[in-house]
């Protein structure tokens, strides 16, 4: 009963609380320095079998858990020059640039929006990256990240899939209920998509990750990783 009351209390804040985003980590906006090229993290804790460079893409979003939107055939993203700056308004961490989306979107539209920006939804390759970027999200709201546990994979995999390879083991991030169990963290046949909540409180445990229905209108975080984008050429 205590758990249910907690969720019921949090959900209204999803749409009723309005606050300007603040940051506890100083990340420079487009600094003029090129994102450095580095090999993808090879993590022995990778939770699922490596399938392709993408662990999932827009073609996987055509199930009943996602909103019904059209996905035109996609071409490989345009070449990103290694001497290029992060675009205006983007944040930099290591070899990636990040966009904090201020429009409320369903998960599938958020993924398409990131693709149109030559990026993916945010995929954390380390706990340092996770902690640095999630605090940049809009305060007192949830933001979509590139982490999904698809209904059609549930019998094969307990852990959710990051959108791209080489990512942090998802059990390491700040789930609401630990140790990580999908059902205890909101997962269901319709709630396949993970979102990160940025609490206005300075208390670290007040911010967390939770599964929500993929049709919910949330903010989102895009990541343009120079290694990933250029490897897809």
From Swiss-Prot:
Glycosylation site list: 31, 81, 225
Keyword Metal-binding: no
Annotated disulfide bonds: 114-222, 193-214
Gene Ontology biological process terms from the UniProt entry: immune response
Single GO cellular component term: external side of plasma membrane
A Pfam family per the record: Lectin_C
Signal sequence coordinates: 1-19
Coiled-coil residue windows: none
UniProt keywords, alphabetically: Disulfide bond, Glycoprotein, Lectin, Proteoglycan, Signal
GO molecular function term, any single one: pattern recognition receptor activity
Domain C-type lectin: 93-223
PANTHER family (alphabetical): CD209 ANTIGEN-LIKE PROTEIN C-LIKE (PTHR46746:SF9), KILLER CELL LECTIN-LIKE RECEPTOR SUBFAMILY F MEMBER 2 (PTHR46746)
Identification of the protein by name: C-type lectin domain-containing protein 87
Annotated source species: Caenorhabditis elegans
């Amino acid at each position: 009963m205590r758990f249910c009351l907690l969720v019921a209390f949090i959900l209204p804040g999803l749409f009723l609380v309005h606050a300007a985003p603040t940051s506890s980590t100083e990340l420079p906006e487009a600094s003029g320095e090129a994102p450095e090229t580095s090999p993808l993290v090879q993590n022995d804790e990778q939770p699922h079998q490596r399938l392709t460079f993408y662990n999932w893409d827009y073609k996987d979003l055509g199930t009943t858990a996602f909103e019904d939107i059209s996905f035109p055939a996609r071409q490989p993203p345009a070449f990103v020059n290694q001497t290029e700056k992060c675009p205006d308004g983007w944040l930099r961490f290591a070899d990636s640039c990040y966009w904090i989306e201020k429009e409320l979107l369903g998960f599938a539209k958020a993924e398409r929006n990131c693709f149109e920006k030559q990026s993916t939804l945010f995929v954390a390759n380390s706990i340092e990256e996770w902690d640095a970027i999630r605090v940049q999200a809009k305060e007192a709201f949830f933001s979509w990240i590139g982490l999904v546990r698809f209904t059609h994979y549930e019998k094969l995999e307990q852990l959710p899939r990051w959108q791209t390879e080489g990512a942090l083991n998802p059990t390491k991030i700040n789930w609401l209920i630990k140790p990580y169990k999908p059902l205890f963290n909101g997962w269901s046949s319709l709630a396949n998509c993970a979102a990160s909540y940025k609490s206005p409180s300075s208390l670290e445990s007040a911010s967390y990750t939770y599964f929500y229905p993929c049709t919910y209108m949330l903010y989102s975080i895009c990541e343009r990783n120079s290694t990933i984008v250029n490897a897809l050429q």
